Amino acid sequence: MGAQLRVYRQRIKSTQSMGKLFKAMELIATSRISKARSRVQASLPYANAITRAVSVVASQSEIHHPLTTEPEQILRAAVLVLTSNRGLAGSYSASVLKQAEQLNTLLQADGKEVKTYLVGNKAQAYFQFRNRSFTKAWVNPTDAPEFATAQEISKTLLEDFAEEFEKDGVDEIHVVYTRFKSMVVQEPTVIRLLPLEVSEEEVSESSDLLPLYEYEPEPEAVLDALLPRYIEARIFNVMLQAAASELAARQRAMKSASDNARDLVKKFTRLANTARQAEITQELSEIVAGADSLNAS
């Protein structure tokens, strides 16, 4: 067997093996997406209900709570960045990190100091490779988030938000994540988590669904109880959307890799056939030449 033909056959074999691996990873991601989407949908009723409740209490009671009051001057901002633990998900993590860098630039241009909190190995590796500091990182499974992790993140952010500036506290909290819209569309998104912003539209919708309340205890105590749960619900919903987006991105990336592997196998097969035909032609030519030499002698 010719050297060139042997190389092509080795490439066909290795590409077929990689193609099987990519196909298996595509099927695994596909099977897990439905569960991830179900978890996103299951988290929405509670998240929407507590958002409406907080909006109504904050707007109708006319109180000034630290978590809902805009500070006179914002000197330090916290940014929570959600990426994946593993690769093979296309540009999923890179897109989130790009969005985080843009937000970082905007905040610093406004004269704000930035404290960064990370979720996922990809974000941690990105910052460590560039020798950039971050406050804290969580590397729990990003494609199957747990509520306990959301509670831990919420507690950390709320504690820093409650601290004074001189004690390394923050004045506002932003979250950078990938919003899951559909299997085809996942959008890197930035939201400001705190101070809580209550839009007129939210208040109007909430007023239609929730009556005016008489508060016992005082509205401040109600908000003290509701707001931590609101933050936990928002962060958990964000983590679930990021997980669904990660799996969708990985499914697309593995499908593309599987298709490319199949195309490469076809290409190498054609090249191997061409090389084999050339080898056979050369052998026939040598046989004919040898026969002619014998006849001539």
UniProtKB/Swiss-Prot annotation:
InterPro entries: ATP_synth_F1_ATPase_gsu, ATP_synth_F1_gsu, ATP_synth_F1_gsu_CS. Its main location: membrane. CDD domains: F1-ATPase_gamma (cd12151). GO terms for cellular component: plasma membrane; proton-transporting ATP synthase complex. Produces ATP from ADP in the presence of a proton gradient across the membrane. The gamma chain is believed to be important in regulating ATPase activity and the flow of protons through the CF(0) complex. NCBIfam families: ATPsyn_F1gamma, PRK05621.1-2. This is ATP synthase gamma chain. It comes from Renibacterium salmoninarum (strain ATCC 33209 / DSM 20767 / JCM 11484 / NBRC 15589 / NCIMB 2235). The lineage of its organism: Bacteria, Bacillati, Actinomycetota, Actinomycetes, Micrococcales.
